[in-house]
Amino acid sequence: MDSQQDNKKWIAVYTKPRHEKTVENELLKKGFEVYLPILKERRKWSDRKKWVEFPLFRSYIFVKTEIKNSLFVLQTMGVVNVIKFGSEIAVIQND
């Protein structure tokens, strides 16, 4: 396995409200691996019904990156912060 791939960890990123798709697209352009879990729900209005997609976790997106590159993630348009426990970036386990 590639040693560079071994250093990559999943981190959670907090976005501006309703900017999850924008952040996903911007991070993909920068070459990051991104995961944005989406739910589909049928919504009903007075005149129509429609399937609507929305994020499972509002204002959160997951990025696989080396911890040292988290600054590049933070500099992405729409990103508010990288989730941390204390002063350390929170790493999401693969299990």
How would you describe each model-predicted region?
Residues M1-D95:
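Acidic-enriched and Gly/Ser
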